[in-house]
Amino acid sequence: MSMLCYTLIIAFLIGIWAAPKSEDNVPLGSPATPDLSDTSCAQTHKALKTSRNTDQRHPAPKKAEDQELGSAANIIVDPKLFQKRRFQSPRVLFSTQPPPLSRDEQSVEFLENEDALNRNIRSKRENHPVNDHGEYSVCDSVSVWVNKTTATDIKGKPVTVMVDVNLNNHVYKQYFFETKCKNPNPVPSGCRGIDSRHWNSYCTTTQSFVKALTKEGNQASWRFIRIDTACVCVISRKTGNF
């Protein structure tokens, strides 16, 4: 009887040990079911790392305003430099805003905001009313404020013109009022009002010198540069007409 009991107990234990387990094929220390939260965290970390590496290889482009301020901040102009300026020209203007189309007759002016520009325009209209008495120009010209990066100085050498001027923590732009011919031949015969039977004529742009703020290396200085300032008529007598 006791022998039968021992046999049954041994058979029962062998059956328990031999029973298959659902986790037998899972590596040691790993759960039978994957943890979705851990997988999501791993994927998120990988995405952030990839994005960070991409940002380092392709940095975000700087805004145009930041680039403009950075280039102007390279050279800070001493206000005393303007006190030493001589031979001021109404064709040179330092402004934080685009200047009006009409040229003011003052020697030099610093315009810092839109109100100053409006006052400049009103002053121009009041001081210079438009009169039309049937007068015509020999040549047609156009005048406009422009920025210049390079020019020719009074010695005939090329110079670098300062476009942005950092003065008292304000960034000003240097503008030049240029005048040039619209057309070398406003009429088929050349200049308007010239007797084409006796004269050859054509319109051409002429230049003059103005004092401008230029730079050489990291130094700013005043130099005379050449700009377009007028449109004139050039005539020559036709051969055989005396």
From Swiss-Prot:
Residues 46-69 are annotated as: Disordered. Disulfide bonds join C139-C203, C181-C231, C191-C233. It is found in: Secreted. GO terms for cellular component: axon; dendrite; extracellular space; synaptic vesicle. Expressed by the venom gland. Pfam families: NGF. Residues 52-66 have a biased composition (Basic and acidic residues). Residues 1-18 form the signal peptide. Belongs to the NGF-beta family. Homodimer; non-covalently linked. This is Venom nerve growth factor 2. It comes from Demansia vestigiata (Lesser black whip snake).
